Amino acid sequence: MKVIFAGTPDFAAAALKAVAAAGFEIPLVLTQPDRPKGRGMQLTAPPVKQAALELGLRVAQPEKLRNNAEALQMLKEVEADVMVVAAYGLILPQDVLDTPKHGCLNIHASLLPRWRGAAPIQRAIEAGDAETGVCIMQMDIGLDTGDVVSEHRYAIQPTDTANEVHDALMEIGAAAVVADLQQLQSKGRLNAVKQPEEGVTYAQKLSKEEARIDWSESADIIERKIRAFNPVPAAWVEYQGKPMKIRRAEVVAQQGTAGEVLSCSADGLVVACGESALKITELQPAGGRRMNIAAFAAGRSIEAGAKL
């Protein structure tokens, strides 16, 4: 069975490797163009391209698929049975969706219809969801509105960051899409179920502005934001006129004026919130490395009563 693969980041690269390891023929891999990255802004291939080249697969990197006759013709010439799409980052128009014999399967990191859109992992943590998961979806022209082929649940742990949930769902998604491809190969079809009309939510793209900590919010809300926005864009506060990223924190039963430092020691930097307080245990000063509070406090002095 011929499988076109379309994806860009690590989340997708894991799925590509799994599909290849399962023995499926992959005549073409689509990924986004190389982009400048890092402090040196060096042109860097996306993880999917790197994985595809290691596997000896053909790679194409169109800037867009909409109104792109050359890309459409390339897809048609492959005569694929199905396309697997994972965090590709480009819109697939209807003519592209219709090209493979069995359409396009998307690996989506939420329990649809909850958290359709760009940042499902982060929004699930931010909202305090007890669980999330992966859906393999038969793509249509809508935003994550297609019928669900399979659903795979994951319990969000109280200390999980977005990075940790991402890595868990990456492995779940890779295994799930392989299982569904194997079913398609053996039965010639997939049983997909329409998404319910109730419970639809949208996972809007993250912004640096919303990641700024508002100490008037409750400690519970802020703690979830810190985990949801870890590693990027990273929750932050202004410290000595510069943004300081907050990487880890826990809720503690203390009270004070919102934004007031209650204590600073090797154990943690405790800051009062609208309700309760947060004990910050890991942070990253502007231009610096991530560090625990013991390392931070050793070179600085933040007195009780100071404002963040």
Swiss-Prot record:
Q: What is its EC number?
A: 2.1.2.9
Q: Output the InterPro entries linked to this UniProt entry.
A: Fmt, Formyl_trans_C, Formyl_transf_N, Formyl_transf_N_sf, Formyl_transferase-like_C_sf, GART_AS, Met-tRNA-FMT_C, Met-tRNA-FMT_N
Q: Which GO terms describe its molecular function?
A: methionyl-tRNA formyltransferase activity
Family recorded in the similarity comment:
Belongs to the Fmt family.
Catalytically driven reaction(s): L-methionyl-tRNA(fMet) + (6R)-10-formyltetrahydrofolate = N-formyl-L-methionyl-tRNA(fMet) + (6S)-5,6,7,8-tetrahydrofolate + H(+)
Report if keyword Membrane is assigned: no
**What does the UniProt function comment say about this protein?**
Attaches a formyl group to the free amino group of methionyl-tRNA(fMet). The formyl group appears to play a dual role in the initiator identity of N-formylmethionyl-tRNA by promoting its recognition by IF2 and preventing the misappropriation of this tRNA by the elongation apparatus.
- Transferase found in the keyword field: yes
Q: Which residues bind (6S)-5,6,7,8-tetrahydrofolate?
A: S110, L111, L112, P113
**Entry GO terms, CC:** cytosol
Q: Which keywords does this Swiss-Prot/TrEMBL entry list?
A: Protein biosynthesis, Transferase
Please report a single Pfam family linked to this protein. Formyl_trans_C
**Gene that specifies this protein:** fmt
The identity of this protein, by name, is: Methionyl-tRNA formyltransferase
Cystine pairs: none
Q: Which domain of life is it from?
A: Bacteria
